[in-house]
Amino acid sequence: MTVATYAAMGSEPNPSAFSSYAERRGCRVAYPCMLSATEAAACGQRMCMRAVAAGDASAAPFIAHPTRAFAATDIDSSRFPIVPAEALDMIVVPLVAFDRAGARLGYGGGCYDRYLSILSPTCQIIGIAFDEQRVDHVPTDAHDLPLPNIVSA
């Protein structure tokens, strides 16, 4: 099984316990890596997922600097290979706010909206949040995808 998660920034819910559990269960765990403008233009995505072996997260520059864009030459692709979107079985998604309809407000870059649209239909998509992030209504545009699953506490 291959799962994608993220390294929490600021006050985001921290999925590191989930990541550790997935690794112990033998799952391949991947993290988002922002792409340079040149590579984003070439593949139509601003973000990819890269596999990170258990215990190797501290060496992954895209985990230490999640908002920085990296060129392919900046990353050791044999150590941190790109995981094709269609290979993901599950993805854990951060969010700023959400509503009862599953609408998600992110940080405004549209990276996850674009990425979620290319996942396999069988991929489980799970947003995680604090209860305080629930709002009555999240304004959406045509490209915004609702999350089928949101877990909050």
What are these regions (language model features)?
Residues 1-87:
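N-terminal active-site beta-alpha-beta segment that forms phosphate/nucleotide-binding
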Residues 6, 94, 153:
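Conserved residues at the C-terminal ends of beta-strands
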Residues 9-11, 96-100:
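Short glycine-rich anion-binding loops that position phosphate/pyrophosphate groups of nucleotides
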Residues 77-82, 86-91, 99-103, 113-153:
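Surface-exposed, charge/polar-rich loops and edge strands
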